[in-house]
Amino acid sequence: MPALGAGHSIFRSVGISYVQGTVRGPGGAEATVRFLIDSGATYSLLPESVWQAIGLVPKREMDFVLADGTSVRRPVSECHLALPQGEGHTPVVLGQPGDAEPLLGVVTLEILGLVFDPFRRVLHPMRALMV
């Protein structure tokens, strides 16, 4: 599978890369989301308007450390996420007012078998090891 860059649903903007995906909740409601690919984020994040629109409910709460060292507690749920490069079921942080834009974190990338190349700013299929 070739690397996916311009022309393959990754949008670039001065050192920042985005990918468009579709999230689906447990009742089948869907939303199209433009995710910031954030290889520094563990979990993906959905804004409150999106997760409420697709009918997600909190399953548990987790503590997170932000880039500035601040700790926050956020609810976490799960949804189906489809990208042009693959799809699967993934945990997502349920964003609160004032939280970041939609983020695509490394747990989701690993679940989908993808890795982000920060130098070329493209998604590649992951080279999986079976050991």
Which stretches of residues belong to each language-model region?
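Pepsin/retropepsin-fold aspartyl endopeptidases
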Residues: 1-131
